[in-house]
Amino acid sequence: MERMLPLLALGLLAAGFCPAVLCHPNSPLDEENLTQENQDRGTHVDLGLASANVDFAFSLYKQLVLKAPDKNVIFSPLSISTALAFLSLGAHNTTLTEILKGLKFNLTETSEAEIHQSFQHLLRTLNQSSDELQLSMGNAMFVKEQLSLLDRFTEDAKRLYGSEAFATDFQDSAAAKKLINDYVKNGTRGKITDLIKDLDSQTMMVLVNYIFFKAKWEMPFDPQDTHQSRFYLSKKKWVMVPMMSLHHLTIPYFRDEELSCTVVELKYTGNASALFILPDQDKMEEVEAMLLPETLKRWRDSLEFREIGELYLPKFSISRDYNLNDILLQLGIEEAFTSKADLSGITGARNLAVSQVVHKAVLDVFEEGTEASAATAVKITLLSALVETRTIVRFNRPFLMIIVPTDTQNIFFMSKVTNPKQA
């Protein structure tokens, strides 16, 4: 079963992620608790999802950085968590518990039914595009033609995750790969073209989740102001990059002296924004070590509008492919990858195990807007006159970018830019 994520376009251009879960051979949900009319519980579970999503995002980020500390990072925690939650529909016993705990859900406070309800509500909320902001998220199952799925699983997959199902001939691996990749390509508006590179003929099912986001900056950068400038990879090493700029504006700003970093927020039109975190020289590791849900909350709560004389941000396009198996093992999701896996909620028999979880993300940041898997908006206004004491913010060294909705603590995309020229 595989799930593909559409891309999200953001103020700069950001693109999207696609995680996929491949299954090879090897708890009942309470309908009443999952009704769309359950508004009171909806607020509770939505907050629970956002909190777990942030915790999962930072835990995953730290593992990705450990593997490649000097590389760019780009991923959609929400896309990955949705794909794994989708998989958990068919999991039982230890396999189920490991997946949900790995996603950072507190199972003593939130039931399995509430977790799926929160994803159901999120999907309904996301799939509401407007002229200002295009945002959609989807799920799909690619199932071996001879595999018989339980009615309960297919019904829950459709009702909770809006999942489409496609009969797939995995014996013809080239055709199966094309079918899946074409689905992802269409869902991400062409941003993700080769999510699946290798497909075993023994594959029984592929789960795909996709998220697409497209938005414009409330205050776009003027292309005529973009110029070549230095981006410092270290104190003594730099590369020349196209540097965008804004002048004389008022934006949410916070100087975090405790963590030696500067935080600014740039808004998109619509309900989305991007947080940019700029550590002081040689302070990136200290900031990364303190990436916690409470840190993000403190940053967002501490933002105050401030007059900025000049803001410089590189124009860039980065993409990364990840095989998440080892990282998910580090996060406690182990049994699903072994012969002990209990995914009997899918077929009724314990004959499936996860062989691979792959994820691809693309982020494009440019003058007019962003295309990516998530977005949040922050208002930027021009000053009527030059300020006497000018604050200048230069993103000319490694920085972090987090794309968030303005009304929740969810994280749609998270990126670390160590080298804008490193595609």
Swiss-Prot record:
<dbReference type="Pfam" id="PF00079">
    <property type="entry name" value="Serpin"/>
</dbReference>
<dbReference type="GO" id="GO:0004867">
    <property type="term" value="F:serine-type endopeptidase inhibitor activity"/>
</dbReference>
<dbReference type="InterPro" id="IPR036186">
    <property type="entry name" value="Serpin_sf"/>
</dbReference>
<feature type="glycosylation site" description="N-linked (GlcNAc...) asparagine">
    <location>
        <position position="271"/>
    </location>
</feature>
<dbReference type="GO" id="GO:0070062">
    <property type="term" value="C:extracellular exosome"/>
</dbReference>
<dbReference type="GO" id="GO:0006953">
    <property type="term" value="P:acute-phase response"/>
</dbReference>
<feature type="DNA-binding region">
    <location>
        <begin position="235"/>
        <end position="237"/>
    </location>
</feature>
<feature type="region of interest" description="RCL">
    <location>
        <begin position="369"/>
        <end position="394"/>
    </location>
</feature>
<feature type="glycosylation site" description="N-linked (GlcNAc...) asparagine">
    <location>
        <position position="127"/>
    </location>
</feature>
<comment type="similarity">
    <text>Belongs to the serpin family.</text>
</comment>
<keyword id="KW-0646">Protease inhibitor</keyword>
<feature type="region of interest" description="O-glycosylated at one site">
    <location>
        <begin position="381"/>
        <end position="389"/>
    </location>
</feature>
<feature type="glycosylation site" description="N-linked (GlcNAc...) asparagine">
    <location>
        <position position="186"/>
    </location>
</feature>
<feature type="glycosylation site" description="N-linked (GlcNAc...) asparagine">
    <location>
        <position position="93"/>
    </location>
</feature>
<feature type="glycosylation site" description="N-linked (GlcNAc...) asparagine">
    <location>
        <position position="106"/>
    </location>
</feature>
<feature type="site" description="Reactive bond">
    <location>
        <begin position="383"/>
        <end position="384"/>
    </location>
</feature>
<dbReference type="GO" id="GO:0034774">
    <property type="term" value="C:secretory granule lumen"/>
</dbReference>
<dbReference type="InterPro" id="IPR042178">
    <property type="entry name" value="Serpin_sf_1"/>
</dbReference>
<dbReference type="GO" id="GO:0005634">
    <property type="term" value="C:nucleus"/>
</dbReference>
<keyword id="KW-0011">Acute phase</keyword>
<dbReference type="GO" id="GO:0003677">
    <property type="term" value="F:DNA binding"/>
</dbReference>
<feature type="glycosylation site" description="N-linked (GlcNAc...) asparagine">
    <location>
        <position position="33"/>
    </location>
</feature>
<dbReference type="GO" id="GO:0005615">
    <property type="term" value="C:extracellular space"/>
</dbReference>
<feature type="signal peptide">
    <location>
        <begin position="1"/>
        <end position="23"/>
    </location>
</feature>
<dbReference type="GO" id="GO:0031093">
    <property type="term" value="C:platelet alpha granule lumen"/>
</dbReference>
<dbReference type="GO" id="GO:0006954">
    <property type="term" value="P:inflammatory response"/>
</dbReference>
<dbReference type="GO" id="GO:0030277">
    <property type="term" value="P:maintenance of gastrointestinal epithelium"/>
</dbReference>
<dbReference type="GO" id="GO:0072562">
    <property type="term" value="C:blood microparticle"/>
</dbReference>
<dbReference type="InterPro" id="IPR000215">
    <property type="entry name" value="Serpin_fam"/>
</dbReference>
<dbReference type="GO" id="GO:0019216">
    <property type="term" value="P:regulation of lipid metabolic process"/>
</dbReference>
<comment type="subunit">
    <text>Interacts with DNAJC1.</text>
</comment>
<dbReference type="GO" id="GO:0035578">
    <property type="term" value="C:azurophil granule lumen"/>
</dbReference>
<protein>
    <recommendedName>
        <fullName>Alpha-1-antichymotrypsin</fullName>
    </recommendedName>
</protein>
<dbReference type="InterPro" id="IPR023796">
    <property type="entry name" value="Serpin_dom"/>
</dbReference>
<dbReference type="InterPro" id="IPR042185">
    <property type="entry name" value="Serpin_sf_2"/>
</dbReference>
<dbReference type="GO" id="GO:0034097">
    <property type="term" value="P:response to cytokine"/>
</dbReference>
<comment type="function">
    <text>Although its physiological function is unclear, it can inhibit neutrophil cathepsin G and mast cell chymase, both of which can convert angiotensin-1 to the active angiotensin-2.</text>
</comment>
<dbReference type="GO" id="GO:0062023">
    <property type="term" value="C:collagen-containing extracellular matrix"/>
</dbReference>
<keyword id="KW-0964">Secreted</keyword>
<dbReference type="InterPro" id="IPR023795">
    <property type="entry name" value="Serpin_CS"/>
</dbReference>
<keyword id="KW-0732">Signal</keyword>
<dbReference type="GO" id="GO:0005576">
    <property type="term" value="C:extracellular region"/>
</dbReference>
